[in-house]
From Swiss-Prot:
InterPro entries: PH-like_dom_sf, PH_domain, SH3-like_dom_sf, SH3_domain, SKAP_fam. Its main location: cytoplasm. It comes from the Eukaryota. It is found in: Cytoplasm. This is Src kinase-associated phosphoprotein 2. One of its GO terms (cellular component) is plasma membrane. The keyword Cytoplasm applies. Residues 243-253 have a biased composition (Low complexity). Residues 296-357 form the SH3 domain. The modification Phosphotyrosine is found at Y75, Y151, Y197, Y260. It comes from Bos taurus.
Amino acid sequence: MPNPSSISAPYPLPEEIRNLLADVETFVADILRGENLSKKAKEKRDALVKKIKDVKSIYLQESQDKGDAEDGEEYDDPFAGPPDTISLASERYDKDDEAPSDGNQFPPIAAQDLPFVLKAGYLEKRRKDHSFLGFEWQKRWCALSKTVFYYYGSDKDKQQKGEFAIDGYNVRMNNTLRKDGKKDCCFEISAPDKRIYQFTAASPKDAEEWVQQLNFVLQDMGSDVIPEDDEERGELYDDVDHPLPSSSPTRSLPIDDEIYEELPEEEEDGALVKVEGQRKMSQDSVHHTTGDKSTNYANFYQGLWDCTGALSDELSFKRGDVIYILSKEYNRYGWWVGEMKGAIGLVPKAYVMEMYDI
């Protein structure tokens, strides 16, 4: 029998053969690896794996040599199947996890040290692999920290395998990435002339939550966030030695004297006075804009996560709770004033999202 490595590939393998060999490779190299095999069976398995690699080398070598000769241009993978725009983009931009991503613009950080994590969990990340399938899915612990998407080998890793800023990207569900039972669990993060990132979540619901959270942050980045320009920054520092008007908070979390109005002759119950004063402040500040709540859908938000107020002026709510936003006066500090079930308090804007797509 001739040595497989000495045979040249006269033509690409038919698609049916590629699919069959891909299934055999997965079964032999991955599934059987976790089985308790006898010594003889292991030897047979290893021999079969070697034969598969020899066959792969025949059909990949010519294409790889051609790609090298053309100074790094993409080679045509005979096992990749018919090209599509998604696959071509993935092949162009999806490098090994260990390679620096996007110029390595973020310093190494442990998974447990990430600040302000908005969404985190295990996902399968798609990467290019020189196998019959053309791609492989790797389990990664992913986290959205502020506006940066990090991915790790596990949630205990001391350094990320890669990361990228989501600014300028688009996020959408994509059920064409897989043909198995997880096809409805896939989503991708893409942008023109940038690397495309493709992931599989544990369930369609989890994938939708990732897409929802990423889109929320992207929309928030382009929303009416008050810019802190030089003039505003100067006003803040110039007025340090002088008292500010009661309507302008001096720190990110307004103190009681700044947001609660004095209510005479109601000092017996301090908590009640604060709540009523806060309610009056909020209602007075937004009375001219709220209008009829039954039709003012843009002000209805819902909780993304459980939130327990650390101070008495902060609203506590659970994931899915409906909150009516009364004011965005403290938007620059990351806080809004909301009302839920008659209670009024400060709401961290990163913990809520719009209920209605208007």
